Amino acid sequence: MIRRFTFQFGAAVVLFLCGGFLASEESRAEDIRFTSVPDIFNWNISNPQSGWEDALDWFFDRLQKEGPDFTLNAGDIMDARWWDDEAQVKRKTEEYWTGFKKRFDDRKMTIYLAPGDHEYGDDGGLKIGHIARAFGKQFTRLMGMPKNGPANHIGRTFFVRKGNLLVVTLDTFEDQGKRFGYTVGKEQLAWLEKTFKANRDAEFIIVQGHLPIVGPVRSKNSSASMLKGGANSGLWKLMVKHGVNVYLCGEHHRITVKKRDGIWQIVHGALWGTQTDLNYLRGSVRPKEMTLELLEFDVEYSGGYIGDHPHRGAKSKPRENVDLAAKTKSEGPRVTGALVLSVGSDGSVEVTKAAGWFEVKLPKKDTTPRK
């Protein structure tokens, strides 16, 4: 499906780029430049991981060059089916999560990470309240995220302000006692409304959370979870009320772009070690304008399967070796979607350019007011 879509929209993307899109190498020094890559890795990948490092060096080089200000990640960094006891959670997160974070720290890259279901032990961990709580404590302790969010999600829900851009990271999982729910609770919503009001002068607002809200979405190698309540949820209604522009999410390991109520929901990310067609997003923000691009590239796998994946079948694991496909090596990633949002004199946001994944059949002008 991805290849057919790319073929159909390839010409539109080329025309879009020729029409004046500013490639990252030509971006202005004052631009805010970032990338987004959810669901990497979604497997227990060590640092270093034999057979992976050349491909990862290539990819992290791109993230660092194209998004020097920060990288967004909407969760699921490891498989993390560590359900034995809290001691196992502590031991394994210290091994794998700190290794993941070190990849960014070694390059002096800033990452803003939202918890995915795998940051609570996957769906199985979310069903065991005390195990999920142990994961949450470790996330707060180890991952080093901003601690300006609500007390019950400290270090897991937070915001950052970069010039005219507000970026909010949410935890789409709530402690409900015996198990965790797939929702955003009242404490987060109250904090979120205060954050929106305190930053009402932001020209653009991006929110990231692991679970998509508006369906249906494409899905592969995923439990296909969605936020409870969908577009009728308190979260969606609050984002509409305060003029959120973009909601970034993952979970489904496929690309789906939807626009509803003035919000662009972008589901993306892919399963490294299993899927051969991978993707990421890059963006830039300057006064009155935000540009987003979706990029895809291909890899190849070989060898056996990486161990240390409890509660998995013999082949339900990542492959031992990852290599860039020949075309990826020679040509780099291909742009398969591009979007430019511009703020007009009346405060409304116009879709001034769109192509590929973003070419949805909707009116070009979004009159959702900026709050």
Regions found by a protein language model. Give the residues of each.
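Extended active-site neighborhood of metal-dependent phosphoesterases/phosphodiesterases
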Residues: 47, 83-201, 224-229, 234-243, ...
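C-terminal segment of classical bacterial N-terminal signal peptides
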Residues: 16-26
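Short, solvent-exposed aromatic-acidic interface loops
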Residues: 294-304
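Short active-site segment of divalent metal-dependent hydrolases/proteases
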Residues: 42, 78-79, 119, 213, ...
